[in-house]
Amino acid sequence: MKVQIVFFSITVFIFVLFLLSVESNTKIKIVPSFLENSNEIEDLYINLDSDSKSSEHTTSSSSSSNSKNKGDSSSSSSNSGSSSNSIISGDSNSKDAPTTSSDSLSPATPIPTDGLLSASTYVTFTGGKVLCENITFCPNGYMYSSDYACNYDIVQNDPATHRGDWNDGIKMFEDPLPKNTTIDQVEGISFTISGAVGCQVTSSATTLEFYIQDLLVLTNTTSRYDICTCGSCYVTFGTEVYKYNMLGYNITGENKFQIQVSVNSMCATTIGITLYYKPPTITPTPTITPTPTITPTPTITPTVTPTATPSTTPSTTPTTTPSTPTPTPTKSPYSGALSPQVKKYIIIASSITGGLLISIFSFVFIRKRLNSKRSGYTQIKDGKDIDTQQIKIGVRIGKGNFGEVYLGTWRGSQVAVKKLPAHNINENILKEFHREINLMKNLRHPNVIQFLGSCLISPDICICTEYMPRGSLYSILHNEKIKISWSLVKRMMIDAAKGIIYLHGSTPVILHRDLKSHNLLVDENWKVKVADFGLSTIEQQGATMTACGTPCWTSPEVLRSQRYTEKADVYSFGIILWECATRQDPYFGIPPFQVIFAVGREGMRPPTPKYGPPKYIQLLKDCLNENPSQRPTMEQCLEILESIETKGFDDIPVNNNNNNNSNNNENNNENNNNSDNNNNDINYSNRVIN
């Protein structure tokens, strides 16, 4: 009987484990296990190719220089007005300067970049500043740079007057590819030149040869003429993307770059090198559902073994009468009724098993309740899978690169439904989509957009969030029918600061990385909520939401692909403060690729607003400081905003973006000196994100 009790207890215990495994497995099915180890933050890689193509043009200008770099090749030429590209795929045997005959060049065909990622780096040319120190502005369509270098001398064959550190066009650069990227993943390459090309107007064309590790990568022939009398005035153009086989390339360190100019001359400020590579292939790990093994309780058949056999043979003696004795059977150890001892064992085992079951189920229930609570906020259900048949889709209220946004009704409430287009679905997008859903469903704050649920069944992949009737802050600022007072701006910026502080205070720290007025949504009571912090990396794939695009709100350290902290979000918050004070687009009319260079390398900032509360204007300038450690924290921004006095200031009018960048150069000097003049005693601590 003891064996029965043991088998019964083991069976009950295995059944309990089965119940727990089913509960655990149900959770795993919501998010596949191969997505749980995804990287939290990806590096920002800037693809200048699409922007640089739009800036290609041909201009005419006179030049007094007729010489070229003595290290450049002069063996290739082209007819006036023509443009061609060639690439070389073989090895070079040259040990010093690269040399390649134009007869060996084969026509190159641009490759498509669909589905490819990109990583960029820059080489800079300096040393020509003294020649153009009196220049303050450039003609329309040209940018100004304080430093540059040229491939020819001011006075022919006079090395003493050489323009800058041209050095035969040779520069070294660090590999920009992400860690663990292999050579086999690299598909193509493109180059972006910021400078003046075609200085000798008497020549018909300019031939540019690009070398990496002394191997010719690309030959570009163009018939463009730019202003070359002063290298400080320049334009930016780029090549298309061509196949690159990475011969001789050092993927773990420094590489040698060289540009050779023939037939004509050029000046350069920077040259961008962009590599295009395939994303890594991720093999999903299948989810294994444990199958419990239940051992059936064996049926024990009782065996009755008599201890003695009664004698049936009569025993007789001559002197006695024979008699048949009555047999006395021995009592069987098994009987129909359980003995008191067996009943005692059964009661004890049942009590222990029942107590264990009650304890386990109580623990699971309490753990669920504790994990779901968020102190200080109204508890709602965690974001979960939604049956799209329960959603009534209404009118379209927005459209972006992520997909279309519709006003919908779900369980009697208005919701915003973002649908992922079927043609946009791939493994990387789904992986990022799952990761960001897991992030958003755990956030609860009055100034953070509420995530309600999602559908992950293709093709109806979508997410549902709360609906904000007044739309984005950007649309409000640019609506001439809406009057905006300084008190309303103060209130909305306080709301935004509280939402960002909540994200920065999370564990681990959540950096928005895409803060802008488009991602601050407003409800019917003018309360502002931070949105799109979860899907920013998806929506930024090749996206520009305005004529200027996301770079206008991005901090200089991010544009330079450097390490960044939560102070990068503080810089973006400063641009939003500027938008509210002016009701204009930052850097209106300047192409995004020029904004990237001007903000990241030249220190350009929007012009300081001339009207508004002094504390507000000073906070705006402090947030845009070049040095991240000199920027205030979001907690300090909130404290300053709450102390601002807005009485006596008129409503902020809508501006038409005219001349809002005319004072950029003057304003840049002021911004660059902020840390020296105003904030020498401030050194905010940073939490560095690798």
Swiss-Prot record:
Its EC number is 2.7.11.1. The keyword Nucleotide-binding applies. The active site is at D514. It is a single-pass type I membrane protein. Pfam families: PK_Tyr_Ser-Thr. The chain crosses the membrane at residues 346-366. ATP binds at I397, G398, K399, G400, N401, F402, G403, E404, V405, K418. Residues 1-24 form the signal peptide. Residues 97-107 have a biased composition (Polar residues). Residues 51-110, 287-335, 649-690 are annotated as: Disordered. It is found in: Membrane. Keywords: ATP-binding, Glycoprotein, Kinase, Membrane, Nucleotide-binding, Serine/threonine-protein kinase, Signal, Transferase, Transmembrane, Transmembrane helix. Residues 57-96, 296-323, 655-681 have a biased composition (Low complexity). It catalyses: L-seryl-[protein] + ATP = O-phospho-L-seryl-[protein] + ADP + H(+); L-threonyl-[protein] + ATP = O-phospho-L-threonyl-[protein] + ADP + H(+). GO terms for biological process: signal transduction. SUPFAM superfamilies: Protein kinase-like (PK-like) (SSF56112). This is Probable serine/threonine-protein kinase drkB.
